[in-house]
Regions:
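Conserved alpha-helical scaffold segments that buttress catalytic/binding sites
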Residues: 1-136
Length: 136
């Protein structure tokens, strides 16, 4: 961001909720230029509308999608790094990702999983995210 490698007019945080470690975290996001669709707004407008808003703003810009698994309700994804109640369901996340199809996705990541906890179930958590984004 500081080097100008990321166009902050096309950078989103989706699904933020609950407590933060400090008020500075929210201020930093705003100062850096992130567009935030918090979980309350996401719930109100739904996953398809959230994706539509993002696609409208991103357009045909090459895109990287990063899914931080602690956006999910802890019961939906055991082994997340930051456990906090009130997250998305896996159904909502998958629907949101399917609605993002058509973006020029050139890379991505799935983060914040404690592999020691979920190693036996990794295919149940990370791999479906990729499939839901794919047009193939």
């Amino acid at each position: 961001m500081d080097d100008g490698c990321l166009d902050m007019t096309k950078a989103f945080h989706v699904g933020c909720r609950g407590s933060v470690k400090s008020k500075d975290m929210l201020i930093e996001d705003t100062e850096q230029g992130w567009t935030t669709i918090d979980l309350d707004l996401f719930t109100d407008i739904g996953p398809v509308e959230a994706a539509r808003r993002i696609k409208r703003q991103i357009g045909d810009t090459p895109t990287i999608v990063s899914v931080d698994m602690d956006v999910l309700e802890p019961g939906e994804c055991p082994g997340v790094g930051f456990i906090e109640a009130g997250g998305m369901t896996s159904r909502e996340l998958f629907r949101f990702l399917r609605a993002l199809r058509g973006l020029d996705v050139i890379g991505g990541e799935v983060s914040d999983i404690k592999l020691a906890v979920v190693l036996d179930n990794f295919e149940m958590e990370a791999f479906p995210l990729t499939l839901n984004m794919s047009d193939k």
